[in-house]
């Protein structure tokens, strides 16, 4: 039998950060209350914290305006960090040589659920 409480989500694609760096920050707030997670992300000094914080704020806004839910009763059910595409660039070196530089991109999906 399905539960009646909704699962609210928000996602962001094509973020200029590697999935590994995003996962380090996502592990801090996975399965935590939304109020605790926003404070953790606000005081975390990593760039990935700002990217995850924006997606989390979007999910909170979806919960408030689309479902009329209270923020205090929400927790982060799951955070999915996925690999997107990789751009390859060339960095010139000495004596006519060149190295490749990989610029990695990621996708984030956050799903919230109401505490029952």
Swiss-Prot record:
Keywords: Ribonucleoprotein, Ribosomal protein, RNA-binding, rRNA-binding
An annotated Gene Ontology molecular function: rRNA binding
Domain of life: Bacteria
Family, per entry: Belongs to the universal ribosomal protein uL22 family.
PANTHER family in the cross-refs: CHLOROPLAST 50S RIBOSOMAL PROTEIN L22-RELATED, LARGE RIBOSOMAL SUBUNIT PROTEIN UL22M
Subunit structure: Part of the 50S ribosomal subunit.
Name the record gives this protein: Large ribosomal subunit protein uL22
């Amino acid at each position: 039998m399905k539960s009646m409480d909704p699962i609210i989500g928000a996602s962001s694609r094509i973020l200029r950060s590697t999935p590994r760096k995003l996962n380090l920050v996502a592990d801090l707030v996975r399965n935590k209350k939304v109020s605790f997670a926003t404070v953790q992300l606000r005081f975390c000094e990593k760039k990935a914290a700002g990217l995850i914080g924006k997606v989390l704020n979007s999910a909170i806004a979806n919960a408030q305006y689309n479902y009329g839910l209270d923020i205090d009763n929400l927790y982060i059910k799951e955070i999915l960090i996925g690999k997107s595409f990789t751009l390859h660039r060339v960095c010139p070196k000495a004596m006519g040589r060149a190295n490749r530089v990989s610029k990695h991109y990621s996708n984030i999906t956050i799903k919230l659920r109401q505490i029952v």
